[in-house]
Amino acid sequence: ESPDRSIREQAFKNLYSVYSAQKNTIAATYAASVKSDAFFAQARKYGSAMEMALSDDNIPLSVYDTLIETVNKSLPLLHRYVALRKKELGVDELHMYDLYVPLVPDADVKIPYEQAKATVKEALQVMGEEYCKALSHGMEGGWIDVYENKGKRGGAYSWGSYGVHPFVLLNHNDTINSMFTLAHEMGHALHSFFTWKKQPYLYADHKIFVAEVASTCNEALLMEHLLKTTKDKTMRKYLINYFLEQFRGTLFRQTMFAEFEKITHAMAEKGEPLTWEGMNKLYRELNLKYFGDAIVVDDEIDIEWARIPHFYNAFYVYQYATGYSAAIALSRKILNEGQPAVAAYLDFLSKGDSE
């Protein structure tokens, strides 16, 4: 994300040169993982490794295929965004190492935790009295470890145990991103809260397929609230860029990963070899398709598949894209339809693993 383009380029090349140096080993390791998936799927009488992976959560194959098909139809929107990025950065050629630099510098706004809490509460008023009462109870009732501290792990996390309220770990640092993280993690926490309130222990967990919906829906509602109430032009540009990057990174990028997994597993199931040359070629073709003509697809990016750890947990990443899509759709439904949509959403939060 460095504003210095030469630093971005050098970091990009240095990173992928390390993976390229180990390409034979990593390709053999990934190929073994894919072949293992294919073997166990065949041994257990599944039609494919993808069918076996999705069966754990009773997800139809059509969900996976429809995601890829629908996102592929929407690729012109990503191409427009890439072209906009090229224009805004003012470069003759946009490269892969230009994708992560912010189009708008981080908004120089300090948001203390108390202000972040108030803003999140205000944004989520649309969720109705029951949800907001639980939200306030969690925020004020000792659920959250707010600030960075010596020996404390980084990042953010929501965790809990049935029969006890959820706990939320934050490392709030007064940034806009920290405020979104608060909304996100409280979405997870309240998902658990409403499930535990209604379901017995047997059904008190959530599948990954739905877990990110509750957290991302809160983020989407916060974003809509901020865009509606913010008057400062620079701040609005920052928020819009933040939102667009979520679509690029969560919907489009994760679907590209999902498509890569689908193809590599199909190759293995047909007895085709999985070599670094073949996977580099495939990954390059996907990047060319997804990002369009406005960007130079650098040779170094061909090996990016080698650094994605999720690929060793086959057919996992698609859930980021479906979860994000569902969250955006639900947030719009809540904003447009009001109480009936809120009631249906709270019912969803209360289901756990019961259905």
Regions found by a protein language model. Name each.
Residues 4-167:
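Contiguous, non-catalytic segments that form substrate-binding/exosite surfaces or channel walls
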Residues 11-14, 18-27, 171, 175-185, ...:
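Structured ligand/cofactor/substrate-binding pocket environments in proteins
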Residues 45, 172-195, 215, 220, ...:
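Active-site recognition of the HExxH zinc-binding catalytic motif
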Residues 46-47, 51, 93-96, 154-166, ...:
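Active-site-adjacent bridging/hinge elements
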Residues 58, 87-97, 182, 190, ...:
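C-terminal, non-catalytic "cap/extension" segments appended to globular domains
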Residues 122, 126-133, 159, 188, ...:
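Conserved helix-loop functional segments at active or binding sites
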Residues 167-171, 198-208, 237-246, 265-267, ...:
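Short beta-alpha connecting loops at secondary-structure transitions
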Residues 206-235, 243-245, 249, 323:
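Post-HExxH zinc-binding segment in Zn-dependent metallohydrolases
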